[in-house]
């Protein structure tokens, strides 16, 4: 399990909505990752749409997947 200090945080834009609350996100460095919504965002019913600016946390062990932790207004 990765510690909070080991997580890498990127900003990106949601390019596609996928089934099961998964999203394709284009990061600021040009890479595309598959990301899911964090638990607190699910709990508070925060909706994410295509084109939203988001923050994505990623573990250094798998840079193709991430967790969306924040949606910019």
UniProtKB/Swiss-Prot annotation:
SUPFAM superfamilies: Nucleic acid-binding proteins. It holds the Pfam family eIF-1a. The keyword Cytoplasm applies. Residues 1-73 form the S1-like domain. GO terms for molecular function: ribosome binding; rRNA binding; translation initiation factor activity. Keywords: Cytoplasm, Initiation factor, Protein biosynthesis, RNA-binding, rRNA-binding. The keyword Oxidoreductase does not apply. GO terms for cellular component: cytosol. Its main location: cytoplasm. CDD domains: S1_IF1. It is found in: Cytoplasm. Transmembrane segments: none annotated. It comes from the Bacteria. PANTHER family: TRANSLATION INITIATION FACTOR IF-1, CHLOROPLASTIC. Belongs to the IF-1 family. Component of the 30S ribosomal translation pre-initiation complex which assembles on the 30S ribosome in the order IF-2 and IF-3, IF-1 and N-formylmethionyl-tRNA(fMet); mRNA recruitment can occur at any time during PIC assembly. One of the essential components for the initiation of protein synthesis. Stabilizes the binding of IF-2 and IF-3 on the 30S subunit to which N-formylmethionyl-tRNA(fMet) subsequently binds. Helps modulate mRNA selection, yielding the 30S pre-initiation complex (PIC). Upon addition of the 50S ribosomal subunit IF-1, IF-2 and IF-3 are released leaving the mature 70S translation initiation complex. This is Translation initiation factor IF-1. The gene is infA.
């Amino acid at each position: 399990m990765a510690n909070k200090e080991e997580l890498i945080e990127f900003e990106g834009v949601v390019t596609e909505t996928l089934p099961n609350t998964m999203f394709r996100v284009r990061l600021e460095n040009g890479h595309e990752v598959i990301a899911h919504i964090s638990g607190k965002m699910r709990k508070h019913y925060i909706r994410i749409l295509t084109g939203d600016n988001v923050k994505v946390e990623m573990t250094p062990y798998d840079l193709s997947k991430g967790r969306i932790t924040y949606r910019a207004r």
